[in-house]
Amino acid sequence: MATKSATVNEPLSGSDYQQKKLRQALLMKRLTNYIPIIGTVVLAAVFFITCLSKGVDVRTNLEIVIKQAMIVGFLATGATFIFAIGSFDLSLGANMLVSAALGATVYNLTGSLWLMLAVCVVACVLMSLLNSALASVFNLPVFVMTIAMMSVFAALSTLIISNVDANGINTKLSRASNPDNVYYQVLGNIWFQLAMLVLFVLLCGFLFNFMKMGRRQKFIGGNPVCARLTGIAPTGITVFSFVIAGIGIGLAAFFTIMQDVSISTSSGGGVGMNMLIAIVFGGMAISGGPRSKALAAFIGGFSMAFLDQFMQVLLMDSATGSAVKQIVKAVLFLTVVTLLNLSYRTKTLER
């Protein structure tokens, strides 16, 4: 009697099913890791195509993109260290404006570019340390602390600028008669500033990924209780994070002066919110932890800058261009967050 050979789909055992789910999760994780880079490339391509089709100057618009991405890049790369430990700070934009106002004032009094740079960085570090003390030493709620300090720093910047000149603090760096004009031609060059941003991002990436302090930051952000039980002191890590953030903010303030020459109360407007969007566009979760990435702010900053300038060129003849741009940015923000969340396995610890 002949027997029929048939293939029967046997149900997977428990271990096989878990292995299959694990492989799917790892594949999804790898794919989502490339979403920010792919998004940046696509937005850059759309930007160039739009500029060419509209007949606008590509070089000029590209320099605008770099200027926008550079300030946000310095600020957000430094802020990555704060978000990595599970904290956040909404006062960074106001912090930058205060230090820029102080730096411009000191330059007008002393005529020293190096002293202006030092004042910008030191002022930002001190203000960041103040936030760190309020957040870690006095155990104030982070949300309350950042809202309060944002108001304080905004009022302080207005006070400094209005006491010098109600229209803003003009450093006159771009004037040919200024002795520092030769240095301004270098420091104010957009490609030199981009090189400085790349150098800063690489340095932060090294600290974040290859140094013991960076790994501890991710540990604290992922599970602060376990980190404390293993002997990691969160206070020292928090202070370190806010200091690095202060350096990034100070550099952003210095190059803001180099770009704008003068500082007013509207300088750096919206940079704080752009920082948050850039970090998310770069593929990093605001909650921090093991998924934190030092390069996220750099990638996200350029994504956002390409998007902004692409929409600006596309809707240059539209009266509702600004509103449409904000709506598109919000939709993309939610889309990126959703795609990134697909790779999370909430029932297991992150590695």
Predicted regions span which residues?
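Transmembrane alpha-helical segments in multi-pass inner-membrane proteins
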Residues: D260-A330
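Transmembrane helix-bundle core of multi-pass membrane transporters
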Residues: F138, V142-F210, D260-T265, S318, ...
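Single transmembrane alpha-helix segments in multi-pass membrane proteins
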Residues: V42-L52, D57-L109, L134-N139, I279-R291, ...
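Inter-helical junctions in multi-pass inner-membrane proteins, predominant
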Residues: S53-I64, T158, S162-V164, F208, ...
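Cytosolic-side transmembrane-helix boundaries in multi-pass membrane proteins
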Residues: M1-V46, G222-G236, L307-R351
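Alpha-helical transmembrane segments within multi-pass membrane transporters and channels
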Residues: G111-S151, G300
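Helix-loop-helix "hairpin" substructures at the membrane interface of multi-pass membrane proteins
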Residues: S112, L117, M127-N131, Q185-S264
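Hydrophobic alpha-helical segments embedded in the membrane of multi-pass proteins
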Residues: Q68-G78, A94-V98, V125-L129, A148, ...
